[in-house]
Amino acid sequence: MLNTLLVVGFGGFIGAILRMFSINLVNKFFPYSISLGTLFVNVLGSFIIGLLFSYAQNKGLSPLLKSFISTGFLGAFTTFSTFSYQNLLLLQSGNYLHFALNIILNVFLCLFAAWLGFIIFK
């Protein structure tokens, strides 16, 4: 159990740092009302989790590695709480078009990315 906790914690540490750098980098080059950095990490994280579970079903993956990637790394790399807060700010500012667009893009692109990642190892 202690090994799992340490592995998840280390994965979370790496995921959180990469999320911060990724969001800042993308938003630096694409400074729009919608945080494309958050969209990027959510889509990429959805793709990676699709790959992970498809690979695990077909080839097998140790429970420790699965915990490291899915719970640790991806749990910290992707961010629904930031997504929710950003949407709240768009809604409060009356920016309804960007509010709707941000929700639609995040939900559909993340679902598509997870599906795409999943079918790669099918």
Curated annotation (Swiss-Prot):
It catalyses: fluoride(in) = fluoride(out). Fluoride-specific ion channel. Important for reducing fluoride concentration in the cell, thus reducing its toxicity. Belongs to the fluoride channel Fluc/FEX (TC 1.A.43) family. PANTHER family: FLUORIDE EXPORT PROTEIN 1-RELATED (PTHR28259:SF1). Keywords: Cell inner membrane, Cell membrane, Ion channel, Ion transport, Membrane, Metal-binding, Sodium, Transmembrane, Transmembrane helix, Transport. This is Fluoride-specific ion channel FluC. The lineage of its organism: Bacteria, Pseudomonadati, Campylobacterota, Epsilonproteobacteria, Campylobacterales. It comes from the Bacteria. GO terms for cellular component: plasma membrane. It comes from Campylobacter jejuni subsp. jejuni serotype O:6 (strain 81116 / NCTC 11828). InterPro entries: FluC. It is found in: Cell inner membrane. The gene is fluC.
